[in-house]
């Protein structure tokens, strides 16, 4: 459920941050701990098991897009939709966008930088999936968008570190 629950919207983020990598790690940890009570019943309701779950790597390598994984992908999307509905963040096929942002504000009220990043990611991802009319597909597409955005956060921090290391090497060579 780990990365699957990540979808449940970057909404239940309870942490502070200073770097992109730290934001990513804290997001994942907070989401896992805060959504577990919703996830298990939703897996059960959708006849899904731990074997149906996709890892972050599975998503980043597009494993879900292979034809033989269509049913697994559908189940994942339906579990995500169920979790969102239990949190009153989705009704029918519509994501309650205003409620998502209210939830982010409630959970991250004392963490401006992380709150701003969560709002940015959610605005982008909700806009991207807005026209999808099937709830399981919409929910899974939202999940994919969030995972990709989180991966970019981590990559951004790695590039900053690479850049700092290169700057140090240039400085050392100049001396």
Task: Describe the predicted segments one by one.
Residues 2-19:
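Cleavable N-terminal signal peptides of Sec/SRP-targeted secreted and luminal proteins
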Residues 19-175:
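Mature soluble extracellular domains of secreted precursor proteins
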């Amino acid at each position: 459920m780990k990365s699957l629950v990540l979808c449940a919207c970057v909404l239940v983020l309870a942490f502070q941050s200073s770097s992109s990598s730290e934001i990513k790690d804290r997001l994942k940890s907070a989401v896992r701990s805060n959504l577990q009570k919703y996830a298990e019943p939703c897996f059960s309701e959708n006849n899904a098991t731990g074997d149906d779950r996709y890892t972050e790597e599975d998503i980043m390598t597009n494993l879900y897009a292979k034809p033989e994984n269509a049913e697994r992908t559908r189940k994942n999307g339906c579990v995500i939709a169920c979790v969102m509905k239990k949190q009153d963040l989705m009704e029918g096929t519509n994501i309650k966008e205003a409620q998502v942002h209210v939830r982010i504000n409630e959970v991250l009220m004392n963490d401006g930088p992380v709150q701003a990043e969560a709002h940015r990611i959610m605005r982008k991802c909700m806009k991207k999936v807005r026209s999808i009319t099937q709830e399981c597909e919409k929910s899974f597409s939202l999940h994919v968008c969030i995972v990709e955005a989180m991966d970019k956060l981590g990559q951004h921090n790695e590039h900053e570190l690479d850049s700092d290391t290169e700057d140090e090497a240039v400085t050392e060579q100049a001396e």
